[in-house]
Amino acid sequence: MEGIKFADVLRSFEKKAEDDEYVSVERDYNERKVIENDVRRTELLGVDKRNRKVIKVLKRLLFVELDKIPIKYTQGMSEIASVFVLYYFQNIVEEEVAKGVLASGSDEESAEESAADGFSEQFIEAPEDENVELKRFVSRHKDTTAILGIVLTNVFRRKLEPLVVDDFKLYKENMRIFVEMMKKKGIRIPELESYKFMGSILTFFLRNLSRMEDVHKVFEIILSCPNTCPFLLLVLFYDKISNGKTIDSIVNNDLFPKVVKLEEEFVETKKRVESRSGFSRMRVMLVGGIASIVAAVVVYKITKKE
């Protein structure tokens, strides 16, 4: 995707689709608790872990946005959303904390306490002063906040939701094609083992990346390509992911041409699998039909004797 950057791709997600809803929703406590726990665990890539106040504000904002968008929450969404929160708000928050617009954390806290703070934050039952501070922050940046909400809704609705609805139907179908593609490369992946890649695919590989430049490169490809794209990237990243290694230095790699080439292979493999499945279904129907005819003949003979 030569000449196309993350920012360019993102612009197409900043606009509301005519037929979609973007109204805020109210979730039940259990779903909010899942979101809260996910946000606590989410690492904000590229943010200094010692900067307690910046992390706290960004995570509060992350929770609030995930809590209100009209998309059923799936675990892992907080990690994807964090990329967009950082894109739109990291510089703003860091600048306001540095200028004292957002009150900084206590100087008496140790670095260890500050680093661990992200794992003990309360979002559902946050202190009133924190809620007031966040509301003022959102009010100051309401236009950017509105864009963030639209982007999150569009990204999840177009790119993640299709994979997880109907009990992960499309995810399972695409994973089956991925397994067939790897088999052609001489790598056999048992069905149960294939599910260990779910954490990579459903976070757009954020868990396997260590640099934001690489994250943006992967995201721009996923956002601009069909929803088979994560499975094609999994083909390319398989060796590193299966060996627990970090995917790095891919900014200057020709990922997009490789994905396009693999898309053709994916389509051909899918046709072959469906053709084979169709033959199996016909065989079952044929055997079932013959069995029915035989049973009917037997019943007819028994009835005739009686």
Curated annotation (Swiss-Prot):
Keyword field contains Kinase: no
Subcellular location: Membrane
Keywords, comma-separated and alphabetical: Glycoprotein, Membrane, Transmembrane, Transmembrane helix
Domain of life: Eukaryota
Transmembrane intervals: 218-238, 284-304
Glycosylation sites: N208
InterPro entries: Rab-GAP-TBC_dom (IPR000195), Rab-GAP_TBC_sf (IPR035969)
Cellular component per GO, a single term: membrane
Membrane topology: Multi-pass membrane protein
The protein, known as: Uncharacterized membrane protein ECU10_0880
UniProt organism field: Encephalitozoon cuniculi (strain GB-M1) (Microsporidian parasite)
